[in-house]
C-alpha cells in the first residue's frame, strides 16, 4: 500500500470512496438526514478544494485507490476507507501519514469523529475533549466527538 498526494485526476475515485463509505457505514449510526448531509458536504467541488490545498492524499493498493485522508493545519478533516478494505490497517496507514505531516508544524492534532470512528481514534491515543452538535433539517442532529492527541516530535 502507498499513500500519495491526491491529484485532480483522482477526484472521481475519491468521490466514490467518500460516498460509498458514507452510504455503507453511516446509516448504522445516524438517520438518513445525516447520511445525506455528509454526501452533500463531500461534493466534487469540496474534493477539488482539498486536492488544491495539497493536504489531501489517497491510499492505493496496487493501482486501486482504496482510501483517502485530508487535513487543514493541525485538524484532520477526513479519513475514509472503502468498506471492503476496512479493518485491515488501511485507516491506520492513512492516519500515520497525516499525523507525520501535521507533526512537522504542530505538537497536537484535532479531529471531529463520527460515531462510527470514535473507537478507532481512541485506539490511536485520541481523547474526547468535547462534543459537537450540528442541527440539520427536520430537527435532526448530527452528533460527533471532538478529539485531540499529543504528537511525538519528529
Where are the regions a protein language model picked out?
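C-terminal "cap" of GNAT-fold acetyltransferases
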Residues: 107, 111-118, 134-154
Amino acid at each position: 500500500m502507498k499513500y500519495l498526494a491526491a491529484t485532480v485526476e483522482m477526484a472521481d475515485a475519491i468521490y466514490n470512496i467518500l460516498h460509498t463509505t458514507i452510504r455503507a457505514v453511516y446509516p448504522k449510526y445516524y438517520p438518513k438526514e445525516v447520511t445525506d448531509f455528509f454526501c452533500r458536504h463531500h461534493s466534487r467541488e469540496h474534493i477539488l478544494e482539498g486536492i488544491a490545498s495539497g493536504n489531501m492524499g489517497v491510499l492505493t493498493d496496487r493501482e486501486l485507490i482504496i482510501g483517502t485522508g485530508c487535513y487543514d493545519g493541525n485538524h484532520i478533516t477526513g479519513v475514509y476507507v472503502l468498506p471492503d478494505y476496512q479493518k485491515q490497517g488501511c485507516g491506520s496507514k492513512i492516519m500515520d501519514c497525516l499525523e507525520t505531516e501535521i507533526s512537522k508544524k504542530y505538537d497536537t492534532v484535532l479531529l471531529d469523529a463520527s460515531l462510527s470512528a470514535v473507537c478507532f481514534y481512541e485506539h490511536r491515543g485520541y481523547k474526547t475533549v468535547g462534543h459537537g452538535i450540528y442541527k440539520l433539517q427536520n430537527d435532526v442532529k448530527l452528533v460527533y466527538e471532538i478529539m485531540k492527541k499529543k504528537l511525538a516530535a519528529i
